[in-house]
């Protein structure tokens, strides 16, 4: 994974036009400074939050369904249709998803590469008509946490994220802001039942995840480097 240096971190802090790029086996991510005016000119805004608990733990969502499996299933024209899946892509799926893929293969097989894969995501989503970005985040955070999270305040600096999924050949655009919540970390560690997020967790506990380095960079940039000034 791309190794970000303190010099590059400072470069993004000081230079509005600077773009920092990370690359993993699966994704290419660019991160750059932006502002509210830039967001308002975007007609299809997706806004996300790097949430910080009241005891200063950055939290992320663990998605219920992997993007890889969702992509495979979305191409299925009937429930019984068998689809080709690259075995190298199974490592980006959950064990129960891999099991279903194995059962539905032309020649049923056993996959021995089971691991502790987690699909990490920032909380948030698309801004609806007549919503502000803050109203959108308030709604999304409530929905994705089963009503657990309540917002204390937002930061006033925003990053623009461009995420290219090299396997799925799709590119996602969004904006990220820091969000301080009222809850302690211990208050949010419980199973969730909404359709998108199965649990919330500490970013610090996911250092072995492919996405960790760029998510940690976002955390450092928005918080440690004073991009997270409170509104």
Curated annotation (Swiss-Prot):
Gene Ontology annotations of biological process type: DNA replication
Name of the protein in question: Putative Nudix hydrolase FPV054
Top EC class for this record: hydrolase
Keyword Magnesium set for record: yes
Domain Nudix hydrolase: 74-217
Source organism of the structure: Fowlpox virus (strain NVSL)
EC number: 3.6.-.-
Record-listed Mg(2+) binding positions: 131, 144, 165
InterPro entries xrefs: NUDIX_hydrolase-like_dom_sf, NUDIX_hydrolase_dom, Viral_VD9
